[in-house]
């Protein structure tokens, strides 16, 4: 099998040495680890299709992988030593960038940061943004329907996509690549593959939407009394800023404390602490003065008791420093010790009640555990993370993983929410899907999987 794969992609693109493949075989949290037969890196859609055709004929299972930044184990092989990791890192070309149509067609291995730079090269803006953007890839972003910090204004990855090129399990290449904003010719196959996590086909390229480059961007860090006050502030800023509101991130005091403790070169923007914080970003497309707008809104918010205090970044460096206080929360938690994490969403108006009830349940069941709920309040996506008690044994704390998951996921369901807001299902949440998904929807999903991947070679053991 290895010889036939080498004949397709070249021997240098087939990696078998364990010291090389190990970096592909472990996901970022260390929850899942596998042993692949090999890692293969095709450099074109044609090579990738030939690989899939060969694997399909020989019933060899394939695990597609982009930047290996996924957080639910969707990109990780099992321990059989028989699965192939199909890395898309060499499919990294920009096929077309069109500032007139406001589109760009990129291959799946382009990193998100590179995609943003391609947009900037023609004075356009690609709004998908997240902490892993230097490593995560467009293919992975689309396979998981990634969210990030600007969903409030632009939607998730699905809403930024006009068309796809997808390698199917039997080696055929499906293309819906198009710069058209209107096309009613049949079923929308593009959206079928977005969020399918490589179980229905392997995304090899995508046509993505571009937007006008914002004239200016302003960042504020706001001190708050509670999530309820944060909700009032969100509604107030929405009404005043309209579509200029790009991000509204909720941060508890413990999260800020952990960042200040564990991340070098960070500092508290306020002279005294607050129980909660919000990071706000506005970026009008028109040549309005965003600083004046944000100053006016926050001044009025403080007067009307929607906020306690606020600071607006006075430079690009300070804006970056404020964003770092949000983006390094997960890393700070990791350095603090054990952390049990949840990527959930609930209706925005119910976020304060959810945080309150979740906190009560955690304290009743694990009295010394420390909830750290933070995230994209503007779109209802919370990362409800729980850090270990001070001085606790990490292994003993993490042994409560399943119990804590049951508590948070049940409450999420009670609130009409989702157990996976933006990270996907992968291996981590596969067993939960039958508990939360409509039975008819599950039946349709299984039928689609059987039709598109009859031999079950595409990312088995993931999602469905």
Write out the residue ranges for each language-model feature.
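C-terminal substrate-recognition/cap domain of FAD-linked oxidoreductases
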Residues: 16-23, 221-224, 231-398, 404-407, ...
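Generic secondary-structure signature for well-ordered alpha-helical cores
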Residues: 3-14, 57-60, 117-124, 147, ...
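FAD-binding subdomain of flavoenzyme oxidoreductases
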Residues: 93-247, 458
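N-terminal flexible segment immediately upstream of the FAD-binding catalytic core
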Residues: 1-53, 70-102, 255-267, 318-340, ...
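Activity-critical C-terminal alpha-helical subdomain
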Residues: 172, 430-464
């Amino acid at each position: 099998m290895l010889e036939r794969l080498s004949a397709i992609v070249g021997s240098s693109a087939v990696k078998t040495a364990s010291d090389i493949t190990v970096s592909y075989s472990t996901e970022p949290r260390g929850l899942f680890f596998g042993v692949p037969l090999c890692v293969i890196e095709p450099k074109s859609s044609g090579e990738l299709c030939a690989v899939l055709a060969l694997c399909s004929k020989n019933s060899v299972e394939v695990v597609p992988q982009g930047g290996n930044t996924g957080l639910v184990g969707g990109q990780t092989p099992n321990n059989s030593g028989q699965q192939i990791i199909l890395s898309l890192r060499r499919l990294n070309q920009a096929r077309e960038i069109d500032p007139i149509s406001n589109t760009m067609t990129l291959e799946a291995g382009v990193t998100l940061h590179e995609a943003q730079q391609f947009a900037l090269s023609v004075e356009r803006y690609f709004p998908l943004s997240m902490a892993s953007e230097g490593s995560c890839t467009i293919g992975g972003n689309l396979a998981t329907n990634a969210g990030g910090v600007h969903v409030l204004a632009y939607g998730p990855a699905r809403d930024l996509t006009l068309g796809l090129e997808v390698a199917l399990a039997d080696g055929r290449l499906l293309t819906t690549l198009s710069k058209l904003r209107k096309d009613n010719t049949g079923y929308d196959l593009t959206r079928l593959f977005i969020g399918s996590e490589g179980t229905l086909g392997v995304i090899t390229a995508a046509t993505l939407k571009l937007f006008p480059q914002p004239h200016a961007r302003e960042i504020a860090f706001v001190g708050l009394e509670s999530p309820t006050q944060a909700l009032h502030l969100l509604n107030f800023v929405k009404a005043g800023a309209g579509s200029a509101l790009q991000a509204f991130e909720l941060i508890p005091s413990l999260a800020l404390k952990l960042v200040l403790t564990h991340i070098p070169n960070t500092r508290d923007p306020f002279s005294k602490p607050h129980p909660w914080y919000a990071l706000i970003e506005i970026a009008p497309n028109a040549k309005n003065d965003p600083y004046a707008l944000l100053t006016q809104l926050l001044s009025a918010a403080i007067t009307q008791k929607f906020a306690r205090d606020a600071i607006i970044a006075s430079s690009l460096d300070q804006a970056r420093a404020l964003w770092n206080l949000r983006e390094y929360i997960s890393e700070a938690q990791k350095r603090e010790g054990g952390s049990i994490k949840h990527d959930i969403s609930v209706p925005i108006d119910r976020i304060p009640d959810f945080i309150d009830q979740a906190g009560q349940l955690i304290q009743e069941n694990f009295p010394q555990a420390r909830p750290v709920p933070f995230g994209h309040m503007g779109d209802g996506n919370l990362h409800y993370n729980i850090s270990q008690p001070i001085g606790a044994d990490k292994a003993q704390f993490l042994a409560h993983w399943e119990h804590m998951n049951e508590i948070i996921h049940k409450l999420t369901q009670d609130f009409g929410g989702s157990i996976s807001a933006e990270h996907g299902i992968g291996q981590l949440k596969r067993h939960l899907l039958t508990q939360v998904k409509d039975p008819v929807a599950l039946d349709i999903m299984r039928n689609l999987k059987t039709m598109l991947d009859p031999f079950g070679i595409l990312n088995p053991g993931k999602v469905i």
